[in-house]
Amino acid sequence: MEDDMTPTKILRPPLSDFGSVRTLALGVVIAPLLAPIVLLPEDWAGWLLLLAAFALVIFHRPFRKNYPLFLTAAFLGLVPIALALVNSYITTLPGGEIDAAAFLQRAEHVSLSGDWPSPMFGANAYVSFLALQFMIFGQSKLLAHASSAFGANLGLVVFERLYTRLSGGRTVSPITLIIFGLLPSALLHKAAVLREPWEALFFSSTVLLLLRLASTWRLATFFCFLISALACGIWHSALSLTALVLLLLAGGIGLRGTTSTARKVLVAILLPVIIAPAAWWAINRSLADRRVSAVSEEAFSSGGIAAIETLAREGAGRASYAHAPGMTGVARLPVGFLYYWLAPLPWQVGNFSDLVALLENLLRTALLIGSLTAYRLSKGQARTNIALALSALLIVELIWSAGTSNWGTALRHHIPSYGPLCAMGIFGCQLYFHHRPMKQSKRPNTLAGRNRTFHQRASASKDCTAPGSRDIS
């Protein structure tokens, strides 16, 4: 009897079993990704880099706060990887045709000959970056595309940090990640062998470090900012000029934001030492950076030149607006900026690429309005952060617009600044809907009135029959 009355114990597997299950599940997921390393040994480095690119996203702690956010981030981390595989093994996607082929061809030549291009700036810097990878790990088309995917996923992580900083500590939402990560032009160009993923990454990181300096000025953060600004400016002359202006802003913040006399003296000494050669280098490179140079002509085969001419004839999102009305004299700057930001206009849409460019411009315009709204509604340090990020955005876009004459190139030039624009724009929309007063309907709610009348009658009858009162019925 006593044995029958003994409560039944619920047997639970030990924690080690759960650990083994997790290990088994992780092995099931990773094994198919590691298999190509054995099957395609010439691309082993590319496959490992793709795994590292995916690990950047799934192991980023803020993305693991909840399942919807984690699944969204994991999906967005897989998209550049999938596009890199398509570009490497199946077909060349739009955005990675002419320029990407030229970069690959030149990088392979440099890795074999050791004839490094000079100066190490702009396209030459990117060719050297690819050639260095080829010299260490061997020539591989997948490796070149995998490095772009790695830069794109690292940019996703930096975007999350930037949004959190701009929004005052808010957690990024899945829809915010989707708006940032699924922009068609950014997706296609970041998965190709192009400079765009690295331009976007280092521009966003430079803005992020600038905001950290505005919050708490530290010398270590300032040196990290210098490294990021240098990495941002090395890819293109427009970005080098932008980095120079941001460096001036950071120096001004350092002089204003510290009470230490010794630190102010140190910043005052460092600024001329850093800015003078940086300004000379940036302006010199900007004046010297004129397309198409003899090196570029040599890089493109005759077939590539023919393809460029075909694209120019058929549009393909690259129609020129250089001869639009008002594009002469002093008026060229504001009018050129408007065309750079808005073109193609609705009546200029001639194909699907133009339609995509039009829709992206409308999205960017809405995000710009949201950014201005964020500045108007925010206060204190948050408003300072928005002002700095908005200044960086307008500076780089104004510099880009001065040297851009077709909306196909403009579509690529919008990519580096899209991270700060997206973060500010979405934060501004959230502030607007949070501050907007609730509008009351003019028509009375009949059902609510009936319910109110019923409750009033019930409470009146309850008062009449309460203790101490007399029931007149």
Where do the PLM segments sit?
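Transmembrane-helix signature of polytopic, membrane-embedded enzymes
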Residues: F159-L182
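Alpha-helical transmembrane segments and terminal signal-anchor/GPI-anchor hydrophobic tails
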Residues: S237, L241-E360, S459
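Transmembrane-helix motifs of polytopic, lipid-linked glycan transferases
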Residues: V57-R61, A146-S167, A366-G370
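Membrane-interface alpha helices of multi-pass inner-membrane proteins
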Residues: P32-P36, L187-L188, L209-L213, T221-A243
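Transmembrane alpha-helix segments characteristic
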Residues: L24-I30, G77, C224, Q381-A402
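Short acidic/glycine- and proline-prone juxtamembrane loop motifs at membrane-interface regions
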Residues: A191-P197
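Membrane-interface helix-loop-helix junctions at transmembrane boundaries of multi-pass membrane enzymes
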Residues: R165-L166, T171, R212, T216-A220, ...
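Extracytoplasmic catalytic/substrate-binding loops of multi-pass membrane glycan-assembly enzymes
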Residues: I90-R106, W116-F129, G138-Q139, V330-P334, ...
